[in-house]
Regions:
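Beta-propeller folds
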Residues: 1-296
Length: 296
């Protein structure tokens, strides 16, 4: 694969051999090679075109040798994240679990370590001291056209309450949009990050029937806009936890999915008391009794 920076001055190409590790090479507009990144996986130019962000996998030969030695999965080496400045400087973040790069600002959010669920948010410019951290984060993402970031956290006992937060990376303002340790799904920004919609259910085992739609506007705490039993929903219908939330282009409309309330398995009925129906065709070449015997 290949990628061209937005200003057209830089090109990154990924070379993948039939067997072994991939390499990302960085070139200028004249075709001069500027840098090489071995064991490369994902690679992205920043919004300003001043940085190239590359995630690196552990070497395949190293991982294979460790697997042969029956090394436990949690003892295998982890990925790394390289933040390369087109001026030549680079920062390496080890033990990478996952990362998201903002599309319109030079910021990155990531988690590292297998047992550490802390979210780290920082500018790509290593000379800037601004850093943010959030504990026990389950999910996070940037808005498409701004530096707004949401994250869902289980919280901690000290400062952070459980719930959905909104972080403005440009101002440093953090807002608790919805407090709760229930289930958040389909968290969705509009393009500019001014509005944030999501589904929420307080009880995990009731998500199939009790999801409600929430909306935060201009960074304000979210309010519930549609819930089970709303007059707009047909009788017996619920907000679907699988439906995709989507704002219109102007963000004046919000689309969400509905469905008849799903039927759930009766867990109070013993298996031997449930009807056992067998279905087969009259013209099958092998009789059902023989099929049943062969299956056993």
């Amino acid at each position: 694969g290949q990628s061209i920076s937005d200003n057209g001055k830089w090109v990154a190409c990924k070379m993948e051999p039939w067997e072994g590790d991939a390499v990302v090479n960085l070139y200028d507009a004249q075709g001069k090679e500027l840098a090489t990144f071995p064991r490369a996986d994902r690679f992205l130019f920043s919004a300003s075109s001043d940085y190239l962000v590359v995630s690196q996998k552990p070497g395949k030969m190293i991982v294979d040798s460790l697997k042969i030695k029956k090394t436990k999965k949690d003892k295998l080496p982890m990925d790394a994240l390289v933040i390369y400045s087109l001026l030549g400087d680079r920062e390496v973040i080890d033990s990478l679990k996952t990362f998201k790069l903002a599309e319109k600002v030079d910021w990155v959010a990531f988690q590292k370590g297998r047992k550490d669920s802390t979210l780290y948010v920082q500018p790509l410019n290593a000379n800037l001291s601004t850093r943010y951290e959030a504990p026990a984060v389950k999910a996070f993402n940037f808005a498409e056209k701004s530096g707004m970031l949401y994250y869902i956290t289980a919280g901690d006992k000290a400062e952070e309450k459980p719930g959905l937060y909104l972080l403005n990376t440009e101002t440093g303002v953090k807002t608790l949009i919805k407090e709760g340790d229930g289930v958040f799904k389909q968290v969705t920004f509009d393009e500019d990050g001014a509005n944030l919609a999501f589904l929420y259910c307080a009880q995990k085992n009731s998500c199939y029937k009790a999801m409600s739609l929430w909306l935060s506007q201009q960074g304000a705490p979210a309010t519930e806009v549609v819930a089970r039993g709303n007059q707009a929903l047909p009788k017996g219908w619920v907000i679907s936890e699988h439906g995709k939330l989507q704002f219109s282009k102007s963000a004046s409309r919000l689309f969400f999915g509905t469905s008849p309330e799903p039927r759930q398995k009766d867990t109070l009925q013993l298996a031997e008391n449930r009807p056992n129906v067998q279905v087969w065709s009259w013209d099958e070449p092998v009789q059902y009794t023989v099929q049943d015997y062969n299956k056993e």
